[in-house]
Amino acid sequence: MNPTFGASILSWIPPMWTPEAGLFAIQQASAAGFDLLEILLPPSMEFDAPTVKRQLKQHGLKETCSLNLPKEAHIPFYPKKATCLIKEALDKASELEVDYLGGVLHSGIGVFSGKQRTREEENMLCEVWAEVAEYATRSGITIGIEPINRYESYMCTSAEEVLRFIKCVNAPNLSLHLDTFHMNIEETSFYEPVIAAGSRLRHIHMTESDRGMLGEGNVRWDDLFRGLQEIDFNGNLVLENFSNSVPGMAEAV
């Protein structure tokens, strides 16, 4: 087991990227001793990738990318828009020369149909994932799908659901992206999802049950790390905690 330890930009800045805020996050991640910075891509994709890449290198950081689909790219309602946006994110990730794009890539956060997920929606989801997975192979990028809790999505709320849809698509570059905050709500175990995923698990958001300091909430860290040890996890462990001390964070999340 040899994971890479990183942090999300959200540990220091709100989700909307600006050159000044981005550089601040890079500087803070480096000063804190992290090896990697997760860049949450803005839906506009408007930032200068070569400059950001140079700044990361100057501060000794690796990088990875994430994208959360906005409401206007909810796959069951707007599959073409979602497909285009994910491809744009893959292009931006390629400019940064990263090999991983994760996040909420199954639905717009907070969008609900008022009904249970349908077979038609499941088929649509698999079709979109298949298309973007094939597109991602051109730049050697693995896509990670993050399940989130039932209060924010009805499409993928557990590791089991994501793994089932990945199996249907059968693309080697689709993987599971876990988040311990959401796991605390939806999973009955922090160990079993890790074991079930095995080598399909590439990335984990490490965050407490209250989004606060690790170890001060309800997340069963011993169970999680026991599973990671058993599968010989070599992916990314990324801190994602939110703080009201970050200007604009409370309004953004």
Question: How would you label these PLM feature ranges?
Answer:
Residues S11-I13, L41-M45, L69-E72, L105-I109, ...:
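Active-site-proximal loop/turn and secondary-structure-junction residues that shape catalytic pockets
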Residues M1-S30, E97-V98, C156-L178, H182-V253:
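Histidine-acidic metal/acid-base catalytic patches
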Residues E46-H59, L85-E97, C126-E134, Y191-A196, ...:
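Short amphipathic alpha-helices and their capping/turn segments at secondary-structure boundaries
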Residues K62, T142, N234:
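Conserved H-loop
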Residues E38, C65, G102, G144, ...:
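Conserved beta-strand positions in the central sheet of alpha/beta enzyme cores
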Residues K71-F77, I109-Q116, Y151-E152, I185-E186, ...:
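A short acidic, helix-capping loop that chelates divalent metal ions and anchors anionic groups
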Residues M1-V98, A171:
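N-terminal pre-domain/capping segments
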Residues P19, Q58, F77-S175:
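Active-site acidic/histidine proton-transfer and metal-coordination neighborhood
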